[in-house]
Curated annotation (Swiss-Prot):
Lineage top rank: taxon: Eukaryota
Organism this protein belongs to: Mus musculus (Mouse)
Signal peptide: none
Entry-linked InterPro entries: Metalthion_dom_sf, Metalthion_dom_sf_vert, Metalthion_vert, Metalthion_vert_metal_BS
The name this protein goes by in its record: Metallothionein-1
Amino acid sequence: MDPNCSCSTGGSCTCTSSCACKNCKCTSCKKSCCSCCPVGCSKCAQGCVCKGAADKCTCCA
């Protein structure tokens, strides 16, 4: 998949472990596709890479 991961809202991303997602709005994260990582997010604990502020997170909620 494109490393920029421009998936649609509500979709799922399947980026590599060294994902450089910049526009990911997916509801189902796989590996490093979270847009951000709020404290206590179990999915982020599994390897998501923070890309933005926690208060804007929609991927790991």
